[in-house]
Amino acid sequence: MVQNSHWLLTKNIIMQKAYLLFGEAAASLQLILDAGNSLQYDLLTPSPKIARGENYKGLPYVMLDYPRHFSKEDIFAFRTMFWWGNFLSFTWHLKGRYALAYRQVIISHHKQLADAGFHLCISEDEWQHDFEATNYFPIHDLSTEAFAMLLDNKAFTKLALKIPLDQWNHANEALMKNYLLILELVKISYQGGEKDPLPGNPKADFGL
């Protein structure tokens, strides 16, 4: 293995392809968000961040965070991940005031999220990304009542979608389809009801 330079070159090519895929996804998201003047939101202001590493549970990965807002108390992030030999994934990660703000619209769209193949994080560790049974549970296997109860009992919410690596050639389309689904939930949350879910932030139309 140490004498096989071809293996390392192949790995570098694949990692670069993942990096380019996420760059395209980030650019498409920026166009959508810019069209809705949504960059006025503090949580959408930071530019896309693409990182790569060599050791998530012993394997290389590439990760895109955009839009992204991380603080000790509050999180709003779209996290897209390529995990070597496992999957591509898209996660909507909410914590603190953002988890509270979007809870009701998430519950009311239980069926849409289930039909799209999303999973709900049931782990107490919000920084685990695998789809083991101790970490994620398929939303389509949860009743609306059970779904709501699980959301109520956690300080954070993570909704995640797994894209098998054998669907790589269609990954960009799958990512955009599900980015738009979640952005539609964000849009509904801002437009619905009498109370702005995030007081002090101007409302936006994502133009979907």
Range-by-range predicted roles:
Residues 67, 121-123, 162:
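A structural detector for beta-sheet-dominated domains
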Residues 55-115:
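Aromatic- and glycine-enriched beta-alpha-beta binding-site module
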Residues 48-53, 129-134, 168-173:
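Short, solvent-exposed polar/charged micro-motifs at secondary-structure junctions
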Residues 51-60, 95, 135-142:
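Short, charged low-complexity intrinsically disordered segments located at boundaries
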Residues 1-71, 75:
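Charge-rich, low-complexity N-terminal segments
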Residues 97-151:
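Short, internal acidic amphipathic alpha-helical interface segments
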Residues 1-34, 135-208:
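Long, solvent-exposed, polar/charged low-complexity segments
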